[in-house]
Curated annotation (Swiss-Prot):
The gene is ndhI. This is NAD(P)H-quinone oxidoreductase subunit I. Keywords: 4Fe-4S, Iron, Iron-sulfur, Membrane, Metal-binding, NAD, NADP, Plastoquinone, Quinone, Repeat, Thylakoid, Translocase. It is a peripheral membrane protein. Residues 169-218 are annotated as: Disordered. InterPro entries: 4Fe4S_Fe-S-bd, 4Fe4S_Fe_S_CS, NADH_quinone_OxRdtase_chainI, NDHI.
Amino acid sequence: MFGFLKKVVDYTRDAADAANYLIQGLAVTFDHLRRRPITVQYPYEKLIPSERYRGRIHYEFDKCIACEVCVRVCPINLPVVDWVMNKETKKKELRNYSIDFGVCIFCGNCVEYCPTNCLSMTEEYELAAYDRHSLNYDNVALGRLPTSVTTDPSVQPLRELAYLPKGVMDPHDVPANQPRAGQLPAEALKSLSLQQESVQGDEGESLQDASDQDQPSG
């Protein structure tokens, strides 16, 4: 008798635990059903990199002293420093500097230990290329000023979602009381067409005024 009652109690406890676990799982599922998908519609939407983002390395040729500290602190000895010794000045003369971003792990050691601060990390992360050899940047390519997402009018920049409090920004739109940092392609084309129409209208009015002034008075 007691054995049968114990089995009934154990079965009831197991059923209650199973129902509790099922309810917890369904609660998580229903919670996600109420949320909109957080999908960045690249390339029409782009994330704005967070503070101290380690993107493409910027290099200043005039500041480099060819000390090769960046090569020694690099985990894979990646930077290539081409220099010759000037016998007259007894100093190194830098000829070329290159970094292969197809191999770089963007650890930032070269930037941190550079004695002249000729290296810096930028927020540029769009480095995709059809040929992996084109990822080997020389001193000219490294010296190019970085591009910023916020200065591109054809995209809608979105701030890093982890740094925003809940409810500040809809994943697919911005709040009504906040202006967009950029424009979608359709909006950019519309604004450009309006600007062209206004310019043409101003030119027509100026020509009409000039013709009226040229006509002799009766």
